[in-house]
């Protein structure tokens, strides 16, 4: 059985797509979003930043958004609610409640032990390691779909997960593989 008691994971970023079910006049939206940029020749949406919650929103005339920089699902929900309140203030009508779809969650973590990445790369399936290009092993998990970057220090970055549960499952799969191939040594007992 894989022991995850020493493993720590922390959310670094959540990216979500959102459908507001409303058409938006971006020139009017620009007036209600003080920390924003809009240059339609370069990009078809408004780039808007909120300080609380600290997120960035890409706002499109179709009523679709991309929210990034969130540290929790609640941050995304709060940012969307905040934008909706501002949009109602300029007369935007919504056909229904917004639909929020998490696209990607990025976690940083620590497995709590060091690894010889050459051994890991030579032994573990579904991984890549090019130390001249990147100092970590890239391990791909098929289900749930995620990518884990494993560094010799035992630090990890997990991206592509759509939930915290998926990230933990991906990490457990990596640990099972490391254990299966003898790449995790048992801790020596203190005398």
UniProtKB/Swiss-Prot annotation:
SUPFAM superfamilies: TATA-box binding protein-like (SSF55945)
Ranges occupied by Sequence repeats: 11-87, 102-178
Example of a GO MF term: DNA binding
Coiled coil: none
Top-level taxon of the source organism: Archaea
Pfam families referenced in this protein's UniProt entry, alphabetically: TBP
GO biological process entries: DNA-templated transcription initiation
Keywords, comma-separated and alphabetical: DNA-binding, Repeat, Transcription, Transcription regulation
Keyword Transcription regulation set for record: yes
Family affiliation: Belongs to the TBP family.
Cited HAMAP family: TATA_bind_prot_arch
Function: General factor that plays a role in the activation of archaeal genes transcribed by RNA polymerase. Binds specifically to the TATA box promoter element which lies close to the position of transcription initiation.
Protein name: TATA-box-binding protein
Protein's organism: Pyrococcus horikoshii (strain ATCC 700860 / DSM 12428 / JCM 9974 / NBRC 100139 / OT-3)
Gene from which the chain derives: tbp
